[in-house]
């Protein structure tokens, strides 16, 4: 969607250390990104940097932009473009800053701000995983199409976004799709994010290996798991597997509401061959009744798209046919419920960029 659109949207990768400014047209980045220090501890300098960065991008364009759209860390009132609250990486915003209205007043074009989980999911739903799966199904001769998607980002935190039939679920308070504060399977009094994040991987590796090296990064732990670096290989693998299990528990709860495909991105997704099997296994878990009867925790069969055999099973299913009573008319009967879990093909940054572009254009059309 929007691949052939000629409108230009300015966008921003808002990090606590640097801002990276760019412009998108037809789902593609059309300028060399402009990188500037974010000056996040000084509001006046930070706002001046935002203006300078967008000005630099605008000067390189042959057509004026129609909007500005980007992800920015919360807490925030995204609908009204106000950023405020406990933002560790943007301390100067804690009292509340009308960032969207500030930029809109300065440039005279609409400004749309969302969280990265939402824009990741939106990008994957419109231009990534969702259309890819539907193309694969069509190629196999199936007329079924998926319309719903749960996007998950694994990194500093446990991010998520939900798209229902091409519409982003933001909720009445801008909290739609959040999973980070779901109950933690292993530590029920804690947030799920405490076991699904960079800090979780580091903590679990320390606990299992007994190595109290605060400088170890998830990349180091991954390389230990791969045998590239010395260390406790079993503990390294287990640290990613535990993250997958804990993420799966929270995702299962979300899927009972969303019922759609799951796509995973973010910095930790590089360890997906350790994370996904544990995650999918958790989605296939069972729950019991007092009578002893067992039920799957999800009504849908779950397939790991990254596993070749699983992917073939997901794509290779046959509809049954049933007769309308009293007639010879046959109708297709879809007696199987199934979803797939996969990794982002383009990566989180690209999907967030495309999500920001699509979100701006969709809002302009409202």
Feature names for model-found ranges:
Residues 19-24, 151-153, 158-163:
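Short beta-strand scaffold segments in enzyme catalytic cores
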Residues 35, 39-66, 188, 202-275, ...:
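Adenine-nucleotide phosphate-binding core of ATP-dependent small-molecule kinases
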């Amino acid at each position: 969607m929007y691949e052939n659109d000629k409108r230009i949207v300015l966008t921003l990768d808002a990090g606590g250390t640097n801002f990276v400014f760019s412009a998108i047209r037809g789902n593609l980045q059309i300028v060399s990104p402009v990188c500037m220090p974010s000056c996040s501890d000084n509001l006046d300098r930070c706002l001046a940097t935002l203006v300078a960065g967008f000005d630099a991008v605008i000067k390189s364009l042959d057509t004026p932009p129609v909007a500005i759209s980007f992800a920015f860390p919360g807490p925030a009132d995204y609908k009204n473009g106000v950023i405020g609250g406990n933002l560790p990486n943007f301390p100067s915003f804690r009292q509340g800053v009308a960032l969207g209205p500030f930029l809109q007043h300065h440039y005279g074009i609409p400004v749309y701000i969302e969280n990265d989980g939402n824009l990741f999911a939106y990008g994957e739903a419109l231009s990534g995983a969702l259309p890819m799966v539907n193309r694969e199904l069509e190629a196999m001769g199936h007329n079924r199409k998926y319309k719903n998607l749960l996007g998950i980002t694994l990194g500093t935190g446990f991010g998520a976004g939900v798209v229902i039939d091409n519409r982003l679920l933001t909720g009445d308070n801008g909290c739609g799709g959040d999973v980070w504060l779901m109950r933690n399977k292993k530590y029920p009094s804690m947030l799920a994010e405490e076991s699904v994040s960079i800090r979780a991987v580091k903590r679990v590796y320390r606990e299992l290996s007994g190595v109290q090296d605060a400088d170890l990064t998830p990349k180091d732990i991954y390389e230990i798991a791969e045998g590239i670096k010395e260390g406790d290989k079993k503990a390294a693998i287990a640290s990613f597997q535990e993250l997958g299990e804990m993420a799966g528990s929270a995702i299962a709860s979300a899927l009972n509401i969303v019922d759609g495909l799951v796509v995973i991105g973010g910095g930790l997704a590089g360890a997906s061959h350790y994370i996904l099997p544990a995650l999918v296994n958790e989605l296939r878990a069972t729950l019991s009744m007092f009578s002893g009867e067992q039920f799957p925790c999800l009504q849908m069969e779950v397939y790991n798209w990254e596993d070749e055999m699983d992917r073939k099973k997901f794509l290779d299913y046959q509809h049954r046919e049933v007769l309308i009573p009293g007639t010879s008319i046959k109708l297709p009967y879809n007696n199987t419920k199934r979803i797939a879990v996969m990794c982002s093909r383009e990566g989180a940054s690209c999907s967030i960029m495309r999500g920001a572009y699509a979100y701006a254009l969709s809002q302009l059309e409202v």
